[in-house]
Every structure is written in structure tokens, then in C-alpha cells.
UniProtKB/Swiss-Prot annotation:
GO molecular function, one term: phospholipid binding
The name this protein goes by in its record: Bridging integrator 2
Membrane topology according to the record: Peripheral membrane protein
Listed InterPro entries: AH/BAR_dom_sf, Amphiphysin, BAR_Bin2, BAR_dom, Bin2_C
Gene from which the chain derives: BIN2
CC annotations in GO: anchoring junction; cell cortex; cell projection; extracellular region; ficolin-1-rich granule lumen; phagocytic cup; plasma membrane; podosome
One of the Pfam families matching this protein, by short name: Bin2_C
PANTHER family, A to Z: AMPHIPHYSIN, BRIDGING INTEGRATOR 2
Record-level GO BP terms: cell chemotaxis; phagocytosis, engulfment; plasma membrane tubulation; podosome assembly
Polar residues bias (residue ranges): 376-385, 453-465, 487-507, 526-549, 556-565
Bias-annotated ranges (Basic and acidic residues): 471-486, 511-524
Keywords: Cell junction, Cell membrane, Cell projection, Coiled coil, Cytoplasm, Membrane, Phosphoprotein
């Protein structure tokens, strides 16, 4: 029996060697072109798709295994960090028991995620890839059977084409050819049916695997987010318990870190605040910051109301001070603003610098009033001129309540008269002159040297005051009281200025440097021609509403150069 088995094994081995030899011989003949090779384009396309599918499947399977390995590593790392936190967390701190539950749930969640990922993703891909080896073997077997089929066909053709025909050999060659053809065609037909199905199954495999992965991630991250919220709340309680202990990031250069801010990992509605500083280096509790912000917001309306009350009080105090200052300044401002208007003041300076130099040269010169005019000799004009003076309306008050303090001014020194300013109260200016024969008599400033136009305003000296809130009303004074007050307040020295002082102002102007004798002669000529222009100033008292109307600018002077100078 043993000898029979050994002989059978030797015969099988010899048969296999003979097949391999015949196959190798056939392949050589096919490569040399001496034998015809059978080809199936449909199968070749399916085989090409299979090899591509196999490569993609093995790559995805390899990446999934690496992903699972990374999850395992992350599980172990997270577990060690949680255990270390639990060890260093003192039992006296708030949230000690809650931290234990968080650590245990964290480990359980990672373990569940790892197991389900390995079962629903990696193992599924492993089953999908396992079928490639079987199909690959069948494709290889089909290739061998194809060579056997080609070899049997070539042998049959050789026997049939031999010169000496042998019926036994021909019958045996036909039998082998039919057998090889049947095996090859059956295997080829199976592969032609299975390969396209396997190739299309890759879509369902990918869908199933990544649906499982996405679902597992969603569940895992949702549960992990809850644990993170719980852990953040525990840390917030601990921070609130020890709010005086602040950790500041320091000792690190800006190049080694992109940001020095320790931001919270979780943003909740209770801790979010628009007023928190994004650049604060400390990790103070956001809840405490939101509470402080809400407290400041509650105090903000009270502070704003207090500021409004303080502003109202300041306005009332300013109005009282203005009332007292207006009564005191009405008599004080009369001294530096007399009603004397000599020929020297009638000449306007070409530039602002000339006007400043004129005031510096003649410290004793007076400011001309808008409506009054005197002759060069200092005597009032004999003809009754009419001056129309008016007080400022309520809309011409101060621009803002805060500017009222700057409007209340004291009397300027006699050497430099104050410039015209917008007054907030309707008090009469110091240049208001009652219509009396003494104030309007004498010479008229309509000489060739100077002419005063009450109707036209110089664009350089005109003042524009924007409308403002209405100032408090002042007690109405009768024209007789104003007249007596202005008469008593006038300075006789200022009203009667010598012609030498009047003309010295003209001499101080650059380009008008003349001798004093020529100026006296000019003054005589001006007094002689003063009667020609008495009609240019008409003074009329407006008794209505007890308001004196006058041109608003106080320095509206238009002059013409004397051709004799």
C-alpha cells in the first residue's frame, strides 16, 4: 500500500512538472509570436478595475487601522491626564466628587468609542478587503487555464497537421483540448460575472464605513462636549473659591507663542460678555467679570442722571453769576469804551498787524462806539445825528452753556480796549450814546480823511454769532435812566481828547510818518469840512420795547485816504 501511494505521488508530481513545462513552453512561443494567445477584452477591463479596487481598499484599510491605533493612544493619554488631575485635586477644593464622575465617564466614553470604531469601521473594511485574495487566486487560476487551453489547442493543431496521422494521438489531443476549454470557459464566465459586482460593491462599503465613523464621532464628541462643560464648571467653581489666586503667563517670548491669552475652551451664555478684555493675561473667572459688568451697567444710568443734575445746577449758577456780572460790568465797561471817535480812529488799518501796532503806540487811544462820533477837536457835533442801536436778540446768545463763563469778562485796561465779543445778555454796551445835542453836536466824521458808515459792515471786522439758547431776561430800564447812567459814566478825559493825541495815532501808521505840524493843519481842514457830511450819520431813538438797535459789528469803519497826506 505504501508503495502504491508513493508511486501515485510520484506520478502526480511528474504530471505537475509536465504541466509547468508545457505552460512555460507555450508562453515562450506566444512571446516569440509562434503561437496564438487567446485574449478577452471584457475580462481584462474587469481585471484592471479589480486591481485598482484592491489597491484602494488596502490603502483605506491601512489608514483605518492607523486611525484606530491613534484613538487607542489618545484614550490612554486622556486616561492618564484625567487620573493625574484626580490625584492632584485636593479634597478640600470644590467639585472634588464631581471630578471623579467626570474622569470615570471620560474613560468609559473613550473605551466605547474605541470598541465601536474597531467593530463598525475597521472590521467591516477588513471583511471587504479579505475577499480580494480569493478573487485574485481565481484570476491567477484563470490565467493558468488559459495557457493550458492555448497549449492544448496548439498541440491539437500540430497533430492534425502532421504528415503521418495517428488516430489515437489525434483523439487524445482533442479530448485534452475539450477538457482545457471547458475548465477555462467556466472559470472565465464566473469571473466575468463576479468582478463587476465586486467592483460596484466598493461604493456601498465606503458609505457604510464612513456613516458608521461619522455617527460614532458625533455621539462621541457630543458626549465629550458635555463632559468638557462639566469639567469647565468644576474649574470655574474652583476659581471662584480661590479668586485671589491669579495665574499670569510670563517668561515666554512673543516669537515662541502666537498668543499670550489663555482663552476658555468652552463659551457659554452665562460667561460671555462683550466687555471682557481679550488681551488680559490673567485667567480670571468670566462669570465674575460678567457680574461686575452687569453691576457697572446698573450704575451707569444713576451716574448719567447725576451728571445731568450737576449740569443743571452749574447752568443755574452760571445764570446767577451772569446776572450779577452784567450789572457790575455795565458800569465797568463804560470806562474803556468811551463815545469818542476821532479822525485817527476813523482810519482803518490795511491789515490786522497795523491795527495791533496802532493800539500799542497809543495806549491812551479810545475805542470808537458804533454810533457816536466826535469832531477832531474833541467837541460833540452841533447837528443832531441819529444813532440806531439795538440789543442782541435771544438767538444771538452764547453758543453753548459751557461757553458762558468765557463771555463774562472784566473791564479791560484803558490802554487796550477789549475786542468786540458776542455777549450773552442784552445789556447795553458801553458805546451806547443817548440822543442828546451834546453827544451829537460838533464836527462830523465825514471829512476826506474818514467817514463812518453805519449801514455797511466791513467784511474784515464783521462778527457773526451763531444762534444760541435764550439768556435770562434782564430788568427793563427806562431811557431816562440809561441816559443818566451813560452821562455819569462817561469820562471827560476820554470825551475830550486833544487833537495831538488823535493825530498821533495816524502818525504811528507805517507809510503815514508826517510831522506833527502837518497833522494839526489836516485836523483844521477836517473840522472845516465836517459840516459837509453831517447827513451820513442819523441818530434816532427807538422807544419800542426799550431796545436800542445798532449795527452788530463794533468796528465797522470805512475810510478813504486823504489825498493831502
Amino acid at each position: 500500500m505504501a508503495e502504491g501511494k508513493a508511486g501515485g505521488a510520484a506520478g502526480l508530481f511528474a504530471k505537475q512538472v509536465q504541466k509547468k513545462f508545457s505552460r512555460a513552453q507555450e508562453k515562450v512561443l506566444q512571446k516569440l509570436g509562434k503561437a496564438v494567445e487567446t485574449k478577452d477584452e471584457r475580462f481584462e477591463q474587469s481585471a484592471s478595475n479589480f486591481y485598482q479596487q484592491q489597491a484602494e481598499g488596502h490603502k483605506l484599510y491601512k489608514d483605518l487601522k492607523n486611525f484606530l491605533s491613534a484613538v487607542k493612544v489618545m484614550h490612554e493619554s486622556s486616561k492618564r491626564v484625567s487620573e493625574t488631575l484626580q490625584e492632584i485635586y485636593s479634597s478640600e477644593w470644590d467639585g472634588h466628587e464631581e471630578l471623579k464622575a467626570i474622569v470615570w465617564n471620560n474613560d468609559l466614553l473613550w473605551e466605547d468609542y474605541e470598541e465601536k470604531l474597531a467593530d463598525q469601521a475597521v472590521r467591516t473594511m477588513e471583511i471587504y478587503v479579505a475577499q480580494f485574495s480569493e478573487i485574485k487566486e481565481r484570476i491567477a487560476k484563470r490565467g493558468r487555464k488559459l495557457v493550458d487551453y492555448d497549449s492544448a489547442r496548439h498541440h491539437l493543431e500540430a497533430v492534425q497537421n502532421a504528415k503521418k496521422k495517428d488516430e489515437a494521438k489525434t483523439a487524445k489531443a482533442e479530448e485534452e483540448f475539450n477538457k482545457a476549454q471547458t475548465v477555462f470557459e467556466d472559470l472565465n464566465q464566473e469571473l466575468l460575472e463576479e468582478l463587476p459586482i465586486l467592483y460596484n460593491s466598493r461604493i456601498g462599503c465606503y458609505v457604510t464605513i464612513f456613516q458608521n465613523i461619522s455617527n460614532l464621532r458625533d455621539v462621541f464628541y457630543r458626549e465629550m462636549s458635555k463632559l468638557n462643560h462639566n469639567l469647565y464648571e468644576v474649574m470655574s467653581k474652583l476659581e471662584k473659591q480661590h479668586s485671589n489666586k491669579v495665574f499670569v503667563v510670563k517668561g515666554l517670548s512673543s516669537s515662541s507663542r502666537r498668543s499670550l491669552v489663555i482663552s476658555p475652551p468652552v463659551r457659554t451664555a452665562t460667561v460671555s460678555s462683550p466687555l471682557t478684555s481679550p488681551t488680559s493675561p490673567s485667567t480670571l473667572s468670566l462669570k465674575s467679570e460678567s457680574e461686575s459688568v452687569s453691576a457697572t451697567e446698573d450704575l451707569a444710568p444713576d451716574a448719567a442722571q447725576g451728571e445731568d443734575n450737576s449740569e443743571i445746577k452749574e447752568l443755574l449758577e452760571e445764570e446767577e453769576i451772569e446776572k450779577e456780572g452784567s450789572e457790575a460790568s455795565s458800569s465797568e465797561e463804560d470806562e474803556p469804551l468811551p463815545a469818542c471817535n476821532g479822525p485817527a480812529q476813523a482810519q482803518p488799518s490795511p491789515t490786522t498787524e497795523r491795527a495791533k501796532s496802532q493800539e500799542e503806540v497809543l495806549p491812551s487811544s479810545t475805542t470808537p462806539s458804533p454810533g457816536g462820533a466826535l469832531s477832531p477837536s474833541g467837541q460833540p457835533s452841533s447837528s443832531a445825528t441819529e444813532v440806531v442801536l439795538r440789543t442782541r436778540t435771544a438767538s444771538e446768545g452764547s453758543e453753548q452753556p459751557k461757553k458762558r463763563a468765557s463771555i463774562q469778562r472784566t473791564s479791560a485796561p484803558p490802554s487796550r480796549p477789549p475786542p468786540p465779543r458776542a455777549t450773552a445778555s442784552p445789556r447795553p454796551s458801553s458805546g451806547n450814546i443817548p440822543s442828546s445835542p451834546t453827544a451829537s453836536g460838533g464836527g462830523s466824521p465825514t471829512s476826506p480823511r474818514a467817514s463812518l458808515g453805519t449801514g455797511t459792515a466791513s467784511p474784515r471786522t464783521s462778527l457773526e454769532v451763531s444762534p444760541n439758547p435764550e439768556p435770562p431776561e434782564k430788568p427793563v430800564r427806562t431811557p431816562e435812566a440809561k441816559e443818566n447812567e451813560n452821562i455819569h459814566n462817561q469820562n471827560p478825559e476820554e470825551l475830550c481828547t486833544s487833537p495831538t493825541l488823535m493825530t498821533s495815532q495816524v502818525a504811528s501808521e507805517p507809510g503815514e510818518a508826517k510831522k506833527m505840524e502837518d497833522k494839526e493843519k489836516d485836523n483844521k481842514l477836517i473840522s472845516a469840512n465836517s459840516s459837509e457830511g453831517q447827513d451820513q450819520l442819523q441818530v434816532s431813538m427807538v422807544p419800542e420795547n426799550n431796545n436800542l438797535t445798532a449795527p452788530e459789528p463794533q468796528e465797522e469803519v470805512s475810510t478813504s485816504e486823504n489825498p493831502q497826506l
